[in-house]
Design a protein with these regions (language model features):
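Glycine-rich phosphate-binding loops of nucleotide-dependent enzymes
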Residues: 2-255
Length: 255
């Protein structure tokens, strides 16, 4: 495992046909952080992640460790250790859990080599299976997994790729309470030696597991800090309640 590196964003700006979607964002996510990114619809959360992962053009700077990410294509950014999930898990559903992990870990190997049944499971794949809690499901088709298990498998696929910066888009959407708790515990383990950023709207989940929170509004950073600090921020209250109340924001924040 490579040493964890932090994400440093400075003056990030994304413009679509004259519309400023991300407006000069500065953001620091330290190694080992489990950062939650929240904000109303149109706040710029997903667009910011799109810029970091090379899906949209942006100006400014986004550095992961010593590497500048802006201006690189998606595949080069991935090879620098940046991994991403979307709201719908991207799996090979007809293949087994083990085969999905094998393919994810198999850059540079032929498809036949990746799909053949072997006597021993590689150490990195075995470790990922244990981390995501799917060791006993390794030989079942990924399409038969429960919703939460599919999300865990996708995270496992990033782990075997040695992703050191994980950008996760609403990982607990549609999960049961038990799945959400297990996912929160999984993210805590993953973040122990990686940098993890979670786009989320579920405030109960955020309260339970976020280490730090960044609130975006209209493409800018509105507030940042612990969950308690963000909820008590008058600026956040103004955006979500229409006025500052002096009481913490308790309602669910839309993604």
């Amino acid at each position: 495992m490579s040493e964890a590196a932090g994400l440093c964003i400075r003056g990030l700006r994304v413009v679509f046909d004259g519309f400023v979607a991300v407006d000069g964002v500065d953001l620091d996510v330290a190694p080992g952080d489990l950062r939650f990114l929240i904000g109303p619809n149109g706040a710029g959360k997903t667009t910011l992640v799109d810029a970091v992962t090379g899906l949209v053009k942006a100006t400014g700077s986004a550095r992961f460790g010593e590497q500048e990410l802006l201006g690189r294509d998606v595949h080069r950014i991935a090879r620098l250790g940046v991994g991403r999930t979307f709201q719908t898990a991207a799996l090979f559903e007809e293949l087994t859990v083990l085969q999905n992990l094998d393919i994810a870990a198999g850059a540079g190997r032929s498809p036949w080599t990746m799909l053949r049944r072997r006597g021993a499971v590689p150490d990195d794949v075995a470790q990922a299976l244990e981390t995501i809690g799917l060791t006993d499901r390794r030989d079942v088709p990924a399409g038969t997994l429960a919703h939460g298990q599919k999300q865990w498998l996708e995270i496992g696929m990033l782990l075997v790729q040695n992703a050191r910066l994980l950008l996760l888009d609403e990982p607990v959407a549609g999960m049961s309470h038990e799945e959400r708790e297990a996912t929160g515990e999984l993210l805590g383990k993953v973040a122990s030696d990686r940098t993890v950023v979670v786009i989320e709207h579920d405030m109960d989940f955020l309260r339970r597991f976020a280490r730090t929170v960044t609130v975006l509004h209209a493409g800018k950073v509105l507030s940042e800090g612990t969950v308690a600090q963000v909820q008590a921020d008058p600026k956040v209250q103004e955006v979500y309640l229409g006025h500052a109340t002096g009481e913490p924001v308790a309602q669910e924040v839309e993604a």
